Each structure stands twice: as C-alpha cells, then as structure tokens.
Amino acid sequence: MAKRDYYEVLGISKSASADEIKKAYRKLSKQYHPDINKEAGADEKFKEISEAYEALSDPQKRAQYDQYGHVDPNQGFGGGAGGGFGGGGFSGFEDIFDTFFGGGGRQQDPNAPRQGSDLQYTMRLKFKEAIFGKDAEIEIPREENCDTCHGSGAKPGTTPEKCSHCGGKGSINVEQNTPFGRVVNKRTCQYCNGTGKEIKEKCPTCHGKGRVTKTKKIKVKVPAGVNDGQQMRVSGEGEAGINGGPNGDLYVVFVVIPDEFFEREADDIYVEVPITFVQATLGDEIDVPTVHGKVRLKIPSGTQTGTTFRLRGKGVPHLRGNGTGDQHVIVKVIVPKKLDDKQKEILREFASTTGDKVDEQTSGFFDKMKRAFKGD
C-alpha cells in the first residue's frame, strides 16, 4: 500500500511554516492519540501523523522529502562502506574510472575491523515524564557476535579458510566491454560475499553468519527537559562490530504524548484558565495547576479575556544548563448564558448606573468598527 503524502497527512500546504507544521501535528496527535481515541485505526493514524511530523519538522529531512518523496535517495546508488556511487546502476562507470585512474586503492580489506551498525529506538513519554525525566529500561533486538564461534562463523575447533575464488581479497576481476574499450572491473566475490573467507564447516548456532539476533535490556536515563522529536545517543549499544571493530551506537528518539490541559513551547508552558464575569470584574484569587503543583494566582479587577499572566520558574527545566522556563496563564472570561429574572434585573441596574459606557480604549475599537461598517 502506497504511503500518503506527508503534507496531506497533516492537512497543510507544501509552503507551510515550521510553526504551522507544529500546530497541525499537535492538533491531530491530540485527536488520534491511542490513549485518548479508542476508535479502530486511531493507533495507525497516530503513527502516520508522527512519521509525517518527524520528516517535515526537520529542515534537512523535509528538503530531502520535497525532492525525493518517499523514495530513499540512496537506493540504487550504493550506500555501502565505499559511499558515493559504489553500487547500483552507476557502478560500471565507477569501475571504469577506477581502472583508468587508479581507483583500485579504494578497495577495503574485507578482514579490516568495521564499526557495527547504529540502531534507533522510539520511546514514548508522557508529558510530565519529558519535563522531569525518568529512568527506563528498554528492550532492543540487535545483532551480536555468536557466543559459540565468537563471530568467526566456523564450527568450534575449525577456522575459516581463505576464499579459493578471490584469494581472500573479497573481490574478483571481471572483464567488461565499455565505450573506452575492454576493461577489467572489480566485483564483490559472490562466493564469500566480500568477506574473503570460506567456511567449510559452519557453526551450528549461527549457521556460518558469525552473528545472532538477541534481545538486549538497556537502562536509559531520560534527562529532564527533553522535547518531542529530540534524540539521545547511547554510545556502544548498537550492533556488534565486524572483525573486532567497535559496536555501533543506539539513538533513542523521544515522542511526547500531548497533554489535554498543558501545552509546551520550547521551555515554556501555556494553559488557558476560565474565570467568571464577576471574577474578571471584581478581581479574585484562583488556584492554577502547574506541572510543579498548584499555584495561587491573583486576578486584578477589570481583567479582560485573553490577558496573560506569567508564573516564573513554573515551566520546563532547561535541558542544557541551569534554570527553568515559565508558565503562561491565559484567562478566558466566561459570560453566563442563562440568567434568572433577578440576575437580569441586577445587570440592568448595573448598566443604568454606568450609563452603559465603555472605556476609551474600547470606545476607540467601536469607532473603528463603525467606520468599517460605513466603508470609511
């Protein structure tokens, strides 16, 4: 099944800004998160949304996606140890230039130590876990050297022999007709798969591969202040090295589950708190939830809807360095929808005592609105 366009998944245009991408992701992730949405297919939808956001939120990945789409740009171009155009449709021309310009020196020793492959693990964190950090234990499947043959691939008591077809070089010379004439190309030996070794008696555990897949438990300390999409490198916890080379690394990518009340922007947290018409008019003190606990907030008289109050130090700990972000409290004045006769009479009396006037700032707004209606 073909993948959907990432921009279509997030419901945004291809010219969308980074802020628009983030807002679209937050909206959709809240709607389809499996912990919130129990409908069938919500989990797959959430994975699709997360994948699209991961690709489009990173400028480099987005540029690559815009150019190549879902196709791997390295596919068919030989993303092997040699890099560049080491394989695929262009290998013939590279071999030609190797022949004429001494490219044979690029051939690697098949028995040289090589670093193991890096691994990636996606860890889902609750909103507060990302803020305060946690100690976690994860399980990852990875290739390790076989304990029976110690990575040689040979049956215990025997040793691999030099490949009789390539002489232990891992490659063979193949003659080829080209526009430049008849040349000799180097090809990976198909008998030893480039290892330069021939195993007569294979290890009964790994069947000659020298490696087996195991599940490894790894303890990971998630630092306080990580954000959605960030990653952490765990050195040496990737796949085992080849020919005695060092292990690869493990990259833990964090996916933060959105909170239904708090919203995060960098190290600051934003919340919207409702207050009554009376509280806004006369002033009050209210309790406001923060990730650090309940805080008492003074609401001055005459507070307007949309007014923002800052609670310093009640945000997210800085991931690098000291200090903590702030929490921004945005108040929303709730106008009563149902009033009894007595309440209506009180408001009418209030309006008559004030002459139903508005202050200068509001008056200026109404003047502008009147001019807009008149077309001035």
From Swiss-Prot:
The keyword Chaperone applies. A zinc finger (CR-type) spans 133-215. Its cofactor is Zn(2+). It holds the Pfam family DnaJ_C. Binds 2 Zn(2+) ions per monomer. Its main location: cytoplasm. GO terms for biological process: chaperone cofactor-dependent protein refolding; DNA replication; protein refolding; response to heat. Zn(2+) 1 binds at C146, C149, C203, C206. InterPro entries: DnaJ, DnaJ_C, DnaJ_domain, DnaJ_domain_CS, HSP40/DnaJ_pept-bd, HSP_DnaJ_Cys-rich_dom, HSP_DnaJ_Cys-rich_dom_sf, J_dom_sf. Residues 5-69 form the J domain. Keywords: Chaperone, Cytoplasm, DNA replication, Metal-binding, Repeat, Stress response, Zinc, Zinc-finger. The keyword Signal does not apply. One of its GO terms (molecular function) is heat shock protein binding. SUPFAM superfamilies: Chaperone J-domain, DnaJ/Hsp40 cysteine-rich domain, HSP40/DnaJ peptide-binding domain. It comes from the Bacteria. CXXCXGXG motif repeats lie at residues 146-153, 163-170, 189-196, 203-210. Zn(2+) 2 binds at C163, C166, C189, C192. Participates actively in the response to hyperosmotic and heat shock by preventing the aggregation of stress-denatured proteins and by disaggregating proteins, also in an autonomous, DnaK-independent fashion. Unfolded proteins bind initially to DnaJ; upon interaction with the DnaJ-bound protein, DnaK hydrolyzes its bound ATP, resulting in the formation of a stable complex. GrpE releases ADP from DnaK; ATP binding to DnaK triggers the release of the substrate protein, thus completing the reaction cycle. NCBIfam families: DnaJ_bact (TIGR02349), PRK10767.1 (NF008035), PRK14276.1 (NF010869), PRK14280.1 (NF010873). Homodimer. The J domain is necessary and sufficient to stimulate DnaK ATPase activity. Zinc center 1 plays an important role in the autonomous, DnaK-independent chaperone activity of DnaJ. Zinc center 2 is essential for interaction with DnaK and for DnaJ activity. Belongs to the DnaJ family. This is Chaperone protein DnaJ. It comes from Listeria monocytogenes serotype 4a (strain HCC23).
